[in-house]
Amino acid sequence: MGKALAKASTLAISENGLEKTSSRRRVEVLKTYKIYIGGQFPRTESGRYYIAANSRGEQLANICLSSRKDFRDAVVAARNAFKSWSGRAAFNRGQILYRMAEMLEARKAQFIEELMKQDASKTHAQKEVTISIDRLIYYAGWCDKYQQLFGTVNPVASSHFNFSVPEPTGVVAVVAPQDNSLVGLVSTIAPTIAGGNTCVILASETKPLCAVSFSEVINSSDVPGGVINILTGKPTELYSHFASHMDVNAVVYCGSDSTIQKELQQKGAGNVKRVLIYQDVNWPDEKGQSPYYILDTQEIKTTWHPIERVGGGGGGY
């Protein structure tokens, strides 16, 4: 059982009635990390779990193996939250993202400890948590600015104003990076919700601790239930359903498995779903953040607004 067994000193009664100290080994209680759906922390519908371990074989926690039913429940929660979240003022979405950064800062020590349990050095863990906090602040600042950057007023040869404005695409399903389990997770969640989308995230299978702890940060950060939903488990069991589910509008895959990429693209094409592949992205680097990641899950809406009597003489066009 590795470190799951720990020595404990106990008191026992000897034959003559006197207390004596004896030593025995007890089973350490591993925390069970639940999934996060609709602002709640349910257990997986399947009742299946796996034990997360590090490279030294130390058992860290019990992790839910999410099922297709869990994924469907998460999509329903994300769809129900979409109308309210996309209709919020962009400035308010920025405030909520900034609040997430504040709450992550308050629990910095916990996340550093969890990263170190998952084989990161202390220096690397401190750096990853700091970058994750800064990344949330970065996207909080973009919430009310990206539309001005990517929106346009188009010249047209008729008596109309013509505007093209980015709007959220809807429910986005994300297969998060397997490495960089915290900063990679934050770097895919933040631009998705900054643009008004809701999301369902499948966290890292091999390093899931920070992902589930991050859901506790989300739950205490004014994020409405259903805007962010975090599942844990095996990508090989769920990724195909990400692309085939008819109520998912876009899929983001962070990985280099060509088989998964091909199947996502084929199934996504079958129901006209946007499929985004982020391969070999160094998420802790500055290139891991950009307003163009917000644009990736936006649709450009063009509006024609009729006008009359323009020009000095009021003669129109």
Question: For each predicted feature, which ranges?
Answer:
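C-terminal segments
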Residues: 2-16, 24-25, 134-149, 163, ...
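Short acidic active-site motifs
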Residues: 124, 160, 237-238, 260
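Hydrophobic/aromatic ligand-binding patch that stacks against planar heteroaromatic rings
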Residues: 190-193, 241, 267
